[in-house]
Amino acid sequence: MKPFMFIMAPVETRSGYGDHARDLITSLIEMDMFDIKIKSVKWGNTPMTGLDKDRPEHLEIEKRLYWEQGLNVQPDVMIHIGVPNEFQNWGKFNVGITAGIETTQCSSDWIQGLNKMDMIIVPSQHSKDVFEKTIFEKKDEQTNQTIGELKCEVPIHVLFEGVNIDIFKKTNEKDEEVEEMMSQVKGECFLFVGHWLKGEMGQDRKDVSGLVKVFCETFKNQKRRPSLVLKTSGADFSHIDRREIRSKIQQIKGTIDSQDIPNIYFIHGDLSEKQMNHLYNHSKVKAHISFTKGEGYGRPLAEAACSGKIVMAPKWSGHIDFLDPKFSILLNGQLTEVHDSAVWEGVINKGSHWFTTDYALAATMIKNLFVNQKAYKSRGHKQAKHISENFSLDKMKEEFKEMVKKEFPKTAKQIDIKLPDLPSMELPTLRSS
């Protein structure tokens, strides 16, 4: 019998964690080394529509979904894909897989969660470094004296999130729905993809507010200028969320000391991976841009880069693993303390730091990129090649298989038993008396 592997993950959700979970689980199924059962869990309010019945690999996942409440047998290996404070260690060998951290320090609850497992897998060197460098003092509750340290005590391995280059690639194909959306965009544009999360002006995690502000200030009163397209949402894809995004954009526009400002568009709603690739490749999109304050990995930036168009993003956190500074535009800035309005208890902690882009320098680079687009074309193509050769889904699967063989415990393998051939024997003939 194959070893029993139990996986807990948001595998059905339309989320970054859902995408990551589906890729990892598909890889494990293809290895054919384990008897796999999967417990599907929610991821916030994201839709539970991540499994596509037209994709054979998703049907293989669906066949292994486990709907029972408990386990009758202890798993040989348990994998929990999620945030560390929720990790469960029900197996004989337990693996925690997390996208990691967007700031300079994780919570003590996360460190305790990491230490419940036998092994941790993260997608970037940034996440590994933060987990290994986060240390808390242990204090006696009675005397308040320091009695030790709380730090990660288990091995952490880096396995990048591979891009499916069969889907995310340079293409001239068109999607009817994407074409209809983009028909409203006037002229050339820069594209941002990501959530618009909580936080005051310039303080939300992806710094969408800062991006909109800088873009408007940079191109106000300019005769020739691009538009900015935001593929974004907040908590979900509801009408209320749509109105809130529109309101935020209008508020920022109201802070600009001119009525002559660039167009800001936003796309709100759930697009398939193929539709996202069509959006990245749309002829009006000239560059991909983000002012993100921190990424555990930054998967959308990797997928966008496969279009062959230049990517502009901060030079800090997870995405610098795959964005080569020779082929991308990495923005300068500095580490700043997380603002109270952006604190998310247990995830983005008060007192931790993340990256704030230097807006003045960014404005200069944005304008230079727009004016000198041709000069950056070859860099965009080289970045796409860099990802397809080094950060593809197939490459990730290869590295994951080697990691499983090397790091997972050796378990008994099923073998066919073949008995040796025995010489034929003749029984003695019995004679009647």
Please place each PLM-identified region on the residue numbering.
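Donor nucleotide-sugar binding/catalytic pocket of nucleotide-sugar-dependent glycosyltransferases
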Residues: 119-171
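Short hydrophobic beta-strand element within catalytic cores of glycosyltransferases
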Residues: 310-313, 329-330
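A charged, aromatic-enriched C-terminal amphipathic alpha-helix characteristic of glycosyltransferases
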Residues: 357-361, 371-402
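N-terminal pre-catalytic "stem/leader" segment of glycosyltransferase-like enzymes
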Residues: 1-74, 227, 401, 433
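Conserved catalytic-core segment of nucleotide-activated headgroup transferases in glycan assembly
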Residues: 20-22, 26-27, 35, 165-275
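C-terminal alpha-helical cap of glycosyltransferases
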Residues: 393-430
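Extended catalytic core of nucleotide-activated donor transferases of GT-like folds
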Residues: 6-8, 45-131
